[in-house]
Amino acid sequence: MATKASSILHPPNETEHTMSRITQEGKKLTYNLKVIQQPERARACGAGAKSSADRRPVDPPPVVELRVFESDLNDQHKTDITFSYNANFFLFATLEWARPIAHGRVQTQTPSCPVLTGVPVAGIAYLDRPTQAGYFIFPDLSVRHEGLYRLNFNLYEEMKEPKHADKGGLVPHSQNHMAPLTPSKPRSPHQFLHFRLVVKSVPFTVYSAKKFPGLAESTSLSRIVAEQGCRVRIRRDVRMRRREPKPNKDYGAYDDRRITPDPYPGTPVERPRSASNASMDDPYRYPTGPPQVQPSPDYGYHHPSHQQPSPNLAATPQSHLSFGAAPPQYHAPPPPPTAHPAPPPAYTSPHLGYTHTRQLSAGPEYDPHRQKYTQYPPPSPHSDIYDQSKSSLPMNPSVDHPSYPPMPYEQRMSDPKLYAPPSQLHPTQQYQQPTPPPPPPAAIAPHPPHQRTPTKPSPSTFFPPTPSRLSVEVDSSNEADDAILNAIRTRRGYILDEKSGATKRSRDSSDHDLKPLRNGQRPVVSGDEAAKGEIGETSGGSDDEIMTYRRADGRLVAKQRVSVHSKGKEVNIPRDVDLLPRRPEVCAVAE
């Protein structure tokens, strides 16, 4: 830095310069020119075709102050006549190298284009602030090439009054003598521009586009000048690039970002759902639930060693965005076993796998054998099947579902969402299950008197399978151990078509036209469509689990939309299953 500072010359007229002259009247006029705002930096704009489009001015804009004083020859009684002096002033800026350059013997070619560009001329502006004086402002000066330069400001004056002319010099003509008498004759000029003095700025650096540090915030002097009507660009934000040492990069225009991502606000984590489903369920659809029926030893098996808090009267349906997440509420236990023939050899149900997030709440009926599978008291009834429109997203079997780890035995036994109430299934859709020890009559007699739909059958009423029907039998030898198997069997393992249509979901009205139609379903108004080969919707089935359609060859095909897990093993469910068109009254999802 010492070598660099020593190589730069400091002329006597740097920053401030003064000159004096004697007028025709013997008065002494003194011109004081001072650079009150020095240029500090600039960006080289180049000399190409696009140099004028992307041009950075010298920052900050140079401001030069002019003051004119009048005094006698002895330099006494000096008076500031800047505002009263009648003359025109303008300042012309030129550019020069800050370091002296030794010229070689070979004559170098002059540059084809000027290095300084922009508006190098400024007229005087008489301002009151910061002090009463004349100011020259250069807001649009640019340099084409990088280097270390300084600006030269040359003051020119155009006199208007003869008394202000130099002593012994040319006197400017008055306005009445300006009209030429003989226009065809050449004449000497009547108006003159007089060079008064020059002042130099301090050296400033012109950077390349890669190393330019950016524009700084506008100075207070620029703001003061702009407030008084001068055209100066005011920058209220700092645009200086924060330069940091880059050992392996020499590109100054890089942003100061790092590999670490910016702390943008991410997607907010879903907060836990409220324990109340008052905003989810229709308040006019279900009546207020009766008091809960507490388990007692007379109603079945009881576990006095495990006392769990009773669930809420209204269970909250699980969000359709949280797949496989266990809700904090307790749900209904599995349905009671019924008297059916003994099952054939073990049959693996294809409907094991994906755990639905659909809320299945308990019906009003109470069965003592539910205590065999869980120790939680059943919640109050409000719906046999959660509203299909609020159910989980339809699962396409072609999409591979992520495998979930198997649940422990204690978690499966205590997970209430795996059990479904008996009121959500139609009696004709019950699976075949081995007959447990029959309960005493006194245990079956007490039931809550509340019934939502008159047409809903009692859970103890079940039709035994007839030889004319196809039934899918499931090995239930490990039903107490496999809670997922029980949940899947209670959700329906096959489809039965009902001709009469008298028994429907309790949430639907008695009219078939009010039933929602989804996924290409068709309304079933009577049993005639079943005779024609049309498969109706299952009364207890889910609208988004099984879809029936007819192929081009006339075959009726059902597509299963779910896939579940059983004991940590994924069970693949066939995508397309042919239904038997010869028996439209009962169709099973056959393997």
Swiss-Prot record:
Q: Which UniProt key words apply to this protein?
A: Cytoplasm, Nucleus, Sporulation, Transcription, Transcription regulation
Bias category Basic and acidic residues: which stretches? 13-22, 245-260, 494-516
Compositional bias (Low complexity)? 422-433
Positions occupied by motif Nuclear localization signal: 40-45
In which residue ranges is the amino acid composition biased (Pro residues)?
Answer: 330-347, 434-448
An example Gene Ontology CC term for this record? cytoplasm
UniProt xrefs under InterPro entries: Velvet, Velvet_dom, Velvet_dom_sf
Q: Tell me the segments the record calls region Disordered.
A: 1-22, 238-547
Xref: Pfam families: Velvet (PF11754)
Q: Where is the Velvet domain?
A: 26-235
Keyword ATP-binding in the entry? The reply is: no
Q: Where in the cell is it found?
A: Nucleus; Cytoplasm
Knockout phenotype, as recorded, reads:
Abolishes cleistothecial formation, switches to mycelial phase faster, and shows impaired switching to the yeast phase once in mycelial phase. Attenuates virulence in mice and macrophages.
Q: Does the keyword Cytoplasm apply?
A: yes
- Free-text function comment from the UniProt entry: Component of the velvet transcription factor complex that controls sexual/asexual developmental ratio in response to light, promoting sexual development in the darkness while stimulating asexual sporulation under illumination. The velvet complex hat acts as a global regulator for secondary metabolite gene expression. Regulates cleistothecial formation and hyphal growth. Acts as a positive regulator of virulence.
**What is stated about domains?**
The C-terminal PEST domain is a region rich in proline, glutamic acid, serine and threonine residues that is required for the light-dependent regulation of development and secondary metabolism.
Q: How does it assemble?
A: Component of the heterotrimeric velvet complex composed of LAE1, VEA1 and VEL2; VEA1 acting as a bridging protein between LAE1 and VEL2.
Stated family? Belongs to the velvet family. VeA subfamily.
Q: What is this protein called?
A: Developmental and secondary metabolism regulator VEA1
